[in-house]
Amino acid sequence: MRFLQALAATFLLFFCMYFLEGTVQISDRFMRFEIELFKAAELALMRIAIDLYTLLPIIVGLAALAMSFLWFRSSEMVAVRSAGISALAAMCVPALCAFLFGIVSIALLNPLVAILTDQFRISAGKIDASLVQSEWIRNGEVVLGRPGQKSESVIRATLVDETKFEFQDADIFLFADDGTLTHWILAETAMLEDSRWQLSNGKIWRIDSDSPNPEKSAVEFEEYELPTDLTRDQVNSSLISLNFVSFWEIEKLIELRERAGISSVEFKVFYSAELAKPLLFAALVLVGAGFTTRPARVGPASIKVLLAALTVLGIYYFSTFTKVLAENERISPFAAAWLPPTVALALALTQLLVVEDG
């Protein structure tokens, strides 16, 4: 119970700091749109969800540190050990609570964060259209120009309707087999349909040695169909950001991206890290206990708290570092996810066993 109280207090502290900061930043960012304070607070609430979720390991570690320090100051741990209960056994319940909280975070909080983050993107985009990012899509093989001539194309456009796969301000670049640019298509709107892009209100420039002046041979159109081998599933999987994906959808998305020939390393790393999160939370609780339950003769309490806090931060940044290595394919996603909690658990058990030895 003490751990849950410390966890709630620590989370509330971080929430208040990030909420106030986010409200001020959003009010300043959308000042020219004369946004109301209530609307700024609503956007801040949606925006900070991903930040707080990312910082959960630090929040859990600091909560465990606060709980253990209170035990140390009130001599509760001394009484527990005098009753014949080891420090390791006394920390089993808080560690189990942290483990269960890790399960709840990936099962319930993760989908909620994905919904709030996506809602922030939509709401902010309605206020300021410049916040809507352009997307780059590799279009596969298309036929354009001379019969039998195939080109590789890349599309840059702004997604405006996810359900209809409708884009605005589309720039389409077509390349020959040797990588040289052959055509440039500019369209006001582009909609992905069955085996084709339906383009509207645009212009086609032919760029090759046969047309030294592309503007002279340029052709304007109201409607144009550009063949493609892309499917809506492939485009959807390539556009999705991890911030908008629920934990329960990641496996399906990984399979979809691999079938479409799109790299899914980042998604595999995230999925493995989420699976390892309960163990990481439990290990961080034991790390906090390992420093603060040592006898008073070992050193001042302030030094113990500082060392414990630095250790928690070190484990967090080590976890981030291993994820970066995995995303760059230096180590496997499994190693990146499970190495930090394993190291943290080994360190915590070492500390607690030293305490038991006296």
Regions found by a protein language model. Give the residues of each.
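Short acidic, Gly/Pro-enriched loop/turn segments at secondary-structure junctions
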Residues: 198-199, 211-212, 235, 239
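Residue-level signal for pocket-adjacent positions within structured domains
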Residues: 180, 225, 320
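Short, surface-exposed beta-strand-loop junctions and turns on beta-sheet-rich folds
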Residues: 163, 205-207, 212-213
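Structural signature for solvent-exposed beta-strand/loop edge elements and short helix-capping sites
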Residues: 144-193, 199-202
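Signature tryptophan residues that serve as conserved aromatic anchors
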Residues: 197-198, 338
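Generic detection of short hydrophobic beta-strand segments and adjacent strand-loop junctions
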Residues: 215-228
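Transmembrane alpha-helices
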Residues: 1-150, 162, 228-358
